[in-house]
Structure formats: C-alpha cells, structure tokens
Amino acid sequence: MERPQIQFKLHRMPPRPFPKVSQDGSKKSSEFSSSRHPKRRRTLVPDSLDQTNKKNKPECSPKRRKFLKQMGILGAGVVLPLKNSKASTLSWEKFFQKHYQEMTPEDKKRVFARIQRETKADYGRDVTISDPQALKGVKFTFCLNLSKCNGSRYCVAACVKENNQSRNPQIQFIKVLEMPHGTLNPEKGNLYYEGKSVPQKNKFYIPVQCNQCDNPPCVKVCPVKATWKQEDGIVVIDYDWCIGCRYCQAACPYEARHFNFKTPSIPRDEINPKQAYLGNRIRPKGVMEKCHFCLHRTRAGKLPACLEACPTGARKFGNILDENSVISKIFQRKRIFVLKEELNTIPRFFYYFE
C-alpha cells in the first residue's frame, strides 16, 4: 500500500516581540515593542493544517482594485446588451436549427416566423415566408433563343428585384456576355459591355445563370449537404445550413454561385415581401446563393421573372416531360446545345439559334 502524499507549504513565522524595558531596568510583559526583529524562523506546515489568519494577508493594491473594477464595468457593458437584445435570442434559435430536410412542419413554422421577425427588425418590412414543394411529374427546363437576345439586360434587372438580391455589394444571378461571332466559348465574352447601345454589329449575347444540372458538381463538393437537387429539377440551397466554405462556387463551371461577403443592402421599398425559404428570401451574410428558376413562382404555375421581362421573347420555360409544352416543341424542332457539354454536368438550361 502506497503512503499518502502530504504536500507542505513554506510559511514565515511572525517576529517574536521583545519585552519593553523601563528606565528602572524592569521588564513589562504586558507591553511589547517591535523596534527590533530577530532572525525569522521558517517551518514546514501541511496545507491541510494551514490556518493562517486571513486578516494578516496583504490586501489588493489600490491600482489593482481600480483596474479590476474598470474591467468588470467594461465586461458588463458588453454582455448585458447582448443578453437583453432580441437579436441574441434570434441567433440562438438559428444556431440550433435543423437541416431543412429534417425539420417537421412545426419546426418549419417556428423557423419561418423567426425569419419574418428578423426581416422586420433588419429592414423594417413585413414579409411572408412560404415553402412551395417540388412538383411531381415535372422537370423544369429553360431554353434561350440566342438569335433574339439583344443584350438589354432587362432579365438581369427583373431577377434582382424579384429575388431580393443585394444592391451593395451588387449580386446578380444572371450575367449577360457579349460574344464575338464565330465562338461559343464564354471565356471570350465581355461581361462589362455598354448596355445602352445594343445589339452591337457582329456581336451576339449569351445570358448565363445556374444550369440546374442533373449531375451537379456543386452538390457533390458541399461538406454539409446544404445544397441538393429536388424532384422537379431545381437545385436548392438551405441558406441557414450553408457554412460559406465556397467549395460549390469553385466547383461550378458556369460561375453561377455567388457569395454574400456583407449583409445584403436592399432599399426597404424594393423588397419583395412574397418570399420562399429555399428561394428568394433575403440571404444572410456569409452564405452562397444562386438562381433557382424562381421556384416561388414556377411551382405556383407562374413564369420566371426574367422570362416575363424579356422584350424580345428569347426565353422559353416549361416542363420537358409534357409533350405539349413549348419546351418539348423546341426540342423537337430546333438544334439545341448546352455550354461546356464535355464536363458531363447534364444541364437543364439550353440554347439554340434560329
């Protein structure tokens, strides 16, 4: 059996007082003088037996006491506003939120209510958050007639307004490239062309956005499964689950994904109040976003905002599984193609010339 370990602590013994001697040489035992100090003795005392009088311990210096007091006031000033703020409560609710695919109807109801409160607090606008489900027996597909596109960018402006995209910093789901005749390589396109005098001679224009690929590389690289493809062909993002690693942005060959570096800046009067959780709701800072075929509209039987804004009728949208749809007829009669076909992403966004 091992011997128990006893720790010892070094203590200084108080000075031994000497009796005070009177003028007649007699000693007064009741009065003591500490004018002289003999050599102090040291003793070893176990910690368990240490009963040093706390009154004899040196007090905290005034400077140290003042410093600790100031730091305490400063800490309280920082913590109390956070403790009492509504924003802190909302952030904790968001932190413990489940993935969209794991939420129950009750969970979704609470989450949507939280987002509505956040939007009201941040932008001063009442909004409604909906959750349109993917349609069964539908494969949404986009076709674009490059012979008609004139590069006016009306589609871009309509998309920005409909989908609550940030004005500063500017985010646009659609980019229109001015291309020289004889090439279909987007790398040779000019994104920053002058839009007031279009179309230019010997130029044509290619709008590029999310292709809603059937083999999406962006989905494969997401480490937290915050993006996935739904039954009707739309690739969606759970903005509250996204960690902003930007792997999907690097994997997308069409440069269709955008990162929110700052809190979106949207004028209050320009906010679209009809929002969808996986669609056009205002995205928070630090997450990815992209085109989603206006799922809050298309799943309700409407057309995408960019299509309605196109002045030349170059855009066509519909269900490829419906043999009588406009899209199906284009597939039957036109020579269609996709961008970067060699990558085998299997896009659902097609182009053609007349």
Show where each model-derived region lies.
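Short Gly/Ser/Thr- and charged-rich N-terminal loops/segments
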Residues: 22-23, 35-42
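N-terminal secretory signal peptides and thylakoid transit peptides that target proteins
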Residues: 52-75
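C-terminal segment of N-terminal export signals and the immediately downstream linker at the start
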Residues: 23-24, 61-62, 81-139, 342-344, ...
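Extended, non-catalytic scaffold segments that flank or surround catalytic motifs
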Residues: 10, 47, 61-63, 94-113, ...
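Long, compositionally biased charged/polar accessory segments in the mid-to-C-terminal portions
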Residues: 296-354
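Cysteine-centered iron-sulfur cluster-binding motifs in ferredoxin-type domains/subunits
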Residues: 142-158, 162, 202-225, 236-255, ...
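Non-heme iron-sulfur electron-transfer modules
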Residues: 125, 162-200, 228-241, 256-286, ...
